[in-house]
């Protein structure tokens, strides 16, 4: 969920609502998943989804980026805490994708975003999904505590 505005217009209620979805819900889900893994003596993988806006700085996205940045920090610490039990935690950091959340942007706004990428295009939703699938697989058994960028080379 995105709440976009400039910092001087910050609305605490809207910010809290966004944090409930983007930060607190994934945290609670992670807590319950790990408790279940411990109960059943199983190893596992947790994948969180962030946003390239954490790493680039776009006007009007400070609040949204802060929520995704919080999730990145949480995921890294989760990996450190639970790695010894065989639980891996990573973040996939997608670039701009054509989704319902981005559907209100004008062509000019989209083109400005594409201009900041090496491939000059929207990030493929399929490539993001395939990255998640890879991280969930045994092929990624040595990857934990990482932010994996799938962003068409956003610069």
Q: What is each residue range found by the language model?
A:
Residues 8-28, 47, 71, 114:
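Catalytic Tyr-X3-Lys loop
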Residues 27, 121-150:
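C-terminal substrate-recognition "lid" of short-chain dehydrogenase/reductases
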Residues 8, 56-62, 84, 120, ...:
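Active-site loop immediately N-terminal to the catalytic Tyr-X3-Lys motif
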Residues 51:
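Residue(s) in the substrate-gating loop at a strand-loop-helix junction
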Residues 30, 67, 75:
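Active-site helix of classical SDR
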Residues 35, 39, 80-84, 141:
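Alpha-helical segment proximal to the catalytic Tyr-Lys
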Residues 1-16, 35, 60-63, 101-107:
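Conserved mid-core segment of classical short-chain dehydrogenase/reductases
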Residues 72-75, 82-97, 143-150:
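Conserved Rossmann-fold SDR core element
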């Amino acid at each position: 969920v995105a709440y976009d505005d400039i910092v001087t217009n910050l609305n605490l209620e809207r910010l809290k609502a966004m944090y409930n979805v983007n930060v607190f819900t994934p945290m609670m889900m992670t807590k319950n998943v790990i408790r279940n893994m411990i109960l059943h003596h199983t190893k596992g993988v947790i994948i969180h989804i962030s946003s390239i806006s954490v790493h680039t700085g776009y006007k009007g996205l400070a609040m949204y980026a802060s929520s995704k940045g919080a999730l990145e920090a949480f995921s890294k610490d989760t990996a450190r805490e639970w790695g010894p039990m065989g639980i891996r935690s990573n973040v996939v950091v997608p670039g701009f994708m054509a989704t319902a959340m981005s559907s209100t942007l004008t062509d000019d706004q989209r083109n400005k975003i594409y201009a900041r990428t090496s491939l000059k295009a929207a990030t493929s939703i399929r490539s993001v999904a395939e990255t998640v699938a890879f991280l969930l697989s045994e092929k990624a058994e040595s990857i934990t505590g990482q932010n994996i960028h799938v962003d068409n080379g956003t610069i």
